[in-house]
Amino acid sequence: MKRILIVTGQSGSGKSSALQVLEDLGYYCIDNLPLALLPEIVAKLDHENNLEQLALGVDVRSTRADMQEFDHVFEQLQKHGTVDVIYLTTQDQDLIARFSASRRPHPLANRFKSLLQCIHEEKQLLIPIQFRATVHIDTTDKSVHDLKHILLSKLGQSDNLIVILQSFGYKHGIPLDADYVFDVRHLPNPHWDLELRRFSGLDEPVKQFLEASPQANEMFEDILHFLKKWLPAFAEGHRHYMTISIGCTGGQHRSVYMVDRLKQALEAEWSVQVLHREMKHWS
């Protein structure tokens, strides 16, 4: 496991929203587990799952005794990856307004008479964790959208659209996760050339074969023009991923070639990921 984030802070300051943002960024998120159980759970996840990014939500539903043991918990978690603590805070009046608007009780409401007392006591309970915080975020007057951009900036991650280029074979079915599908079965098929059949669209002989085809070049230019025109609009709509699927008959030659060529044309401007779905079927 490469990175573990502990997300905590005052109730009402945006912990749930922060975890949602992190989940969208690919973090595996766990919320509201007792603090004492975290080392055991993280050790199990690290052993049984190929997780690279984990986010753990912690709040005052853990006991005061648990909070005092936070340093020990923190050290145990460090055995499994780099650990950072994100601490969210908000001014008292803003917290009061948020609880009034949501009509939800404060987690300490059963112990104290007033909301302000709950807020002040919670601050004291969280001191052991706040002391360890590597990222402090004041969410006063901040929207969820603002919080997202602050998190991205603090964590050194990009808010750019990720373009997933996927090749596939129609005989194995159309991908269900595709946002756009382009059919390149009309292009000359290297499969029928016995010298080329054993290669894929990543190999130079197949590339040369298809680059000699005016149809293949025209199809490439048309798809590239579409993507260059519309990807900025998709990015402005706050999409995290856009999956563009290119299909040929078997998913070995024409679609693979087209995906590879599009990747080279787009990767200077966009974050591009490539998936060749039928690679296991290649001859």
UniProtKB/Swiss-Prot annotation:
Binding sites annotated in the UniProt record for GTP: 59-62
Decide whether keyword ATP-binding is in the record. Answer: yes
GO MF entries: ATP binding; GTP binding
Q: Indicate the secretion signal residues.
A: none
> What keywords is this UniProt entry annotated with?
ATP-binding, GTP-binding, Nucleotide-binding
Iron as a keyword of this entry, yes or no, is no
Source organism, top-level taxon: Bacteria
The record's section on SUPFAM superfamilies has: P-loop containing nucleoside triphosphate hydrolases (SSF52540)
One Pfam family recorded for the sequence: RapZ-like_N
Instruction: Enumerate the InterPro entries for this protein.
Output: P-loop_NTPase (IPR027417), RapZ-like (IPR005337), RapZ-like_N (IPR053930), RapZ_C (IPR053931)
* Residues that coordinate or bind ATP: 9-16
Q: What does this protein do?
A: Displays ATPase and GTPase activities.
What family does the Swiss-Prot or TrEMBL record give for this protein?
A: Belongs to the RapZ-like family.
Question: By what name is this protein known?
Answer: Nucleotide-binding protein A1S_0588
